[in-house]
């Protein structure tokens, strides 16, 4: 009995493959579309990549012949959604974006805009890498939430925007922090200052304020005597900024030690009349 089932399955499989291969070689657009639609619907319902890949290949074969025809909209959507469902988000992002631009009055426009944005969200890399796709995702998600305030994906899109913005924020912070940790003081001061200015409500700002102060302090005490006072006074300014904003900071003990050393150095410079 088991052999019978295996034989029957093999026959069906061969018949299915034969039908697909025959369609690939055919010039009959309607036949290709009918079979592609069958594969597509099964693939979507059962999340079968093999069926969707077959649908994609057939649909991409016939799409050029459908340009300017009503069926082009249907085929364009099916291709984009098939790529989206199999998780090929680089292509689905591009495909849905092109669909939205080509068919702005489509009843599926909201879905297309969100799925394009979500595709870029899915390919957004970790914070330490190039963030081009992150910026694209933010632009597209923001466009979606502006256009569809009552949209089906509005809440999720806003949550995704928060995730992506936090990623960019962390990247900016890590770049500035690394300058401090690598003891490149002057660029660190500049980068940390920019970070604070660009991200006024950041969860990293306590660290950023302290590292900015510490960078200025070390930069100052390693300066020539003629310019040390001015740089120390700037360090005092950054110290005051830090302690006024974070009086209970975990860095307070270290900050106070630096401040005492600054005061001692300023007193010494006063004695030298510099």
What annotation goes with each model-predicted range?
Residues 2-8:
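Sec-dependent signal peptide recognition
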Residues 12-14:
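Hydrophobic core
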């Amino acid at each position: 009995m088991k052999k019978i089932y295996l034989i029957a399955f093999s026959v069906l499989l061969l018949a299915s493959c034969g039908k697909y291969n025959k369609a690939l070689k055919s010039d009959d657009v309607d036949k290709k579309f009918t079979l592609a639609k069958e594969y597509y619907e099964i693939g979507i319902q059962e999340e079968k990549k093999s069926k969707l890949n077959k649908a994609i290949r057939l649909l991409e074969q016939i799409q050029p012949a459908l340009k300017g025809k009503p069926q082009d909209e249907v085929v364009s959507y099916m291709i984009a959604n098939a790529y989206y469902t199999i998780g090929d988000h680089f292509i689905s992002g591009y495909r849905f974006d092109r669909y939205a631009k080509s068919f702005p009055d489509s009843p599926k426009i909201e879905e297309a805009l969100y799925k394009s944005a979500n595709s870029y969200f899915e390919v957004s890399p970790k914070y330490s890498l190039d963030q081009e796709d992150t910026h694209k995702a933010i632009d597209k998600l923001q466009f979606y939430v502006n256009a569809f305030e009552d949209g089906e994906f509005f809440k999720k899109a806003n949550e995704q925007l928060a995730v992506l913005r936090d990623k960019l924020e962390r990247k900016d912070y890590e770049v500035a922090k690394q300058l401090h940790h690598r003891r490149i003081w002057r660029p660190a001061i500049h980068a940390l200052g920019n970070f604070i200015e660009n991200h006024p409500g950041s969860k990293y700002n306590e660290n950023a304020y302290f590292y900015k102060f510490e960078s200025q302090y070390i930069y100052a005490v390693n300066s020539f005597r003629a310019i040390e006072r001015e740089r120390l006074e700037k360090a005092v300014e950054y110290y005051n900024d830090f302690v006024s904003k974070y009086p209970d900071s975990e860095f307070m003990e270290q900050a106070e030690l630096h401040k005492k050393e600054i005061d001692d150095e300023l007193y010494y410079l006063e004695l030298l009349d510099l």
